[in-house]
């Protein structure tokens, strides 16, 4: 490969181990699984570490394949490493801890919003590249993002004001289903 970022692909029909009869047998073996997942909703959640490790493009290729097989996808991403890095860059003396609920000040909330927006745009851009040099090249994947989560403020607990900290109250499932009905991720 001339560019280390390019993903090398080989046509299954050209690979020696996939002679036409072998390919047909393999295809027949996977067909029931394809039928089983078509139309199902998969929620794919991953942490910000995946993006930090530059594995987003590989994930997008896999998700595009699932989408092409008729799987409806809901993608949920984390951002802890990126938020902590942004807080450090801005000189804010706070680090988010996974699984720990702490009061969220306005400046911390702003960092969280900036990072979440940046990651969302990175994900959308990865899907919008047309997946060059992959078996999914020229596929059109549509992304719909929105405020599908309704939050509930934590409020004051044991005399501690949790400021802008919230927890999930509910998900707007009707809006998610409408987006999925449009064959969007």
Regions found by a protein language model. Give the residues of each.
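A sequence-level detector of short, solvent-exposed, charge-rich linear segments
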Residues: 42, 46, 56, 85, ...
